[in-house]
């Protein structure tokens, strides 16, 4: 009986499907409907950094990754480390807990950073509160960006004042570690002029008990249009003060639960001196840019930057891997202070000339840049002996405890301090 019911069901099913097959065959003469489309997502079409002219990315002979303002907002990008997480061929380094450090196609750098196409080579942690988009150029490009750029450059494009729009935007966030962040972006249209103010404050805390700090910045910008000329003037103040935490060192094979890699079980151990490890940065930056339409085919653009930077970095750090025995592990530590004072002057001018020869259109670029930089950098080494200033006394092997017990440290500045660095440099560069 069961066999009969199953067979009947199959027959009914086949019978029911017969007309459908016939209908499908009858519909073969119906007009075809084709739907096409694409999702832009974060796609951008043109770049200005690669050639200093608005050029389609497909026409730029270099690999370029563009992070748009929408992507920065959606992914809450607040640091270079956040940024490069989504960019192939680029990775972030630790930066000794006091600066941005990236590897671009195998080339490690702390200096190949630019703002609006102007060099930004001071060592600090960059924020993105006033950044409209970021263009990452991979591969050597000294012809466009000048010195450096062996593996590529990271160029941040700042937000400009908008003459025909009022904008009010604020962001607030906090996390379970106790850190919090707030930013504001206000643009006020004033006829043919505009005022834009960006600012942020961030209280720094994370899973490491010894780490804390704060950073904040403000960037007012005013723009005005006078006939065929647009001018923009901006000032930025940046302050960053934090504990210099260089993380967890590695351990030799056969020690600390047998890793030949990062030591295990020291998630909260601070491998430094809590009342000494500190990074403090302050910057005053003045920017000016203009664009003049001289004729239908000629456009003249200028940019200028003045920056005054002051940074101090003090740290005790793990100079060796963890050694000793499982019962009595040890680690070698060293210390130094690294103050830097720098003043930077940059002036840049470009003339764009559009011409035609027959059916071909050309865009010619004539430009030049003048750079001046006065810098004073010193490395003051720490010694674990008040009388014998030798390389042997620059390192001390201590027991691995939590907290780490650091012996008294003596800092000596000048030629008597073995292996110290005291560099004063003045750079004047003209390129065209």
Q: Can you annotate each of these PLM segments?
A:
Residues 188, 222-226, 292, 353-356, ...:
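Residue-level signature of outer-membrane beta-barrel architecture
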Residues 100-102, 152, 166-170, 180-184, ...:
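Hydrophobic, lipid-facing positions within transmembrane beta-strands of outer-membrane proteins
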Residues 1-27:
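Cleavable N-terminal targeting peptides that direct proteins into the secretory/outer-membrane pathway or into
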Residues 202-206, 219-223, 230-293, 308-342, ...:
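Acidic/polar loop-and-plug regions of large Gram-negative outer-membrane beta-barrel proteins
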Residues 164-168, 180, 191-195, 227-231, ...:
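Outer-envelope beta-barrel architecture signal
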Residues 129-132, 143-220, 226-230:
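Outer-membrane beta-barrel translocator/receptor signature
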């Amino acid at each position: 009986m069961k066999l009969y019911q199953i067979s009947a069901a199959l027959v009914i099913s086949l019978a029911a499907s017969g007309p459908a097959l016939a209908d499908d065959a009858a519909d073969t003469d119906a007009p075809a409907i084709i739907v096409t489309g694409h999702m832009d997502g974060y796609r951008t079409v043109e770049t200005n950094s690669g050639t200093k002219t608005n050029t389609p990315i497909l026409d730029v002979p270099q690999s370029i990754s563009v992070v748009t303002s929408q992507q920065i907002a959606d992914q809450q990008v607040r640091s270079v480390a956040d940024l490069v997480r989504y960019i192939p061929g680029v990775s972030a380094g630790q930066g000794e807990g006091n600066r941005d450090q990236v590897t671009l196609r195998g080339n490690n750098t702390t200096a190949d950073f630019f703002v609006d196409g102007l060099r930004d080579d001071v060592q600090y942690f960059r924020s993105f509160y006033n950044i409209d988009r970021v263009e990452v150029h991979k591969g050597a490009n000294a012809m466009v960006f000048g010195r450096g750029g062996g593996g590529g450059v990271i160029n941040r494009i700042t937000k400009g004042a908008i003459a025909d729009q009022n904008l009010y935007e604020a962001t607030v966030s906090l996390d379970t570690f106790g850190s919090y962040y707030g930013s504001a972006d206000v643009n006020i249209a004033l006829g043919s002029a505009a005022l834009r103010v960006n600012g942020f404050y961030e209280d720094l805390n994370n899973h490491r008990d010894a780490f804390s700090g704060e950073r904040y910045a403000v960037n007012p910008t005013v723009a005005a249009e006078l006939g065929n000329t647009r001018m923009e003037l901006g000032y930025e103040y940046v302050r960053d003060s934090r504990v210099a935490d260089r993380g967890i060192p590695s351990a030799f094979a056969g020690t600390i639960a047998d890793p030949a890699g990062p030591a295990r079980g020291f998630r909260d151990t601070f491998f430094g001196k809590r009342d000494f490890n500190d990074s403090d940065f302050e910057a005053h930056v003045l920017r000016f840019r203009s664009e003049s339409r001289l004729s239908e085919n000629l456009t003249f653009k200028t940019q200028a930057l003045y920056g005054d930077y002051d940074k101090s970095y003090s740290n005790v750090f793990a100079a060796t891997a963890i050694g000793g025995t499982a019962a009595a592990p040890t680690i070698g530590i060293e210390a130094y202070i690294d103050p830097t004072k720098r003043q930077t002057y940059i002036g840049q001018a470009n003339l764009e000339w559009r011409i035609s020869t027959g059916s071909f259109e050309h865009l010619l670029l004539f430009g030049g840049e003048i750079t001046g930089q006065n810098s004073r950098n010193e490395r003051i080494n720490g010694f674990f002996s008040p009388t014998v200033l030798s390389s042997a006394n620059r390192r001390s092997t201590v027991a691995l405890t939590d907290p780490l017990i650091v012996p008294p440290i003596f800092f000596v500045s000048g030629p008597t301090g073995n292996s110290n660095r005291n560099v004063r440099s003045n750079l004047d560069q003209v390129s065209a």
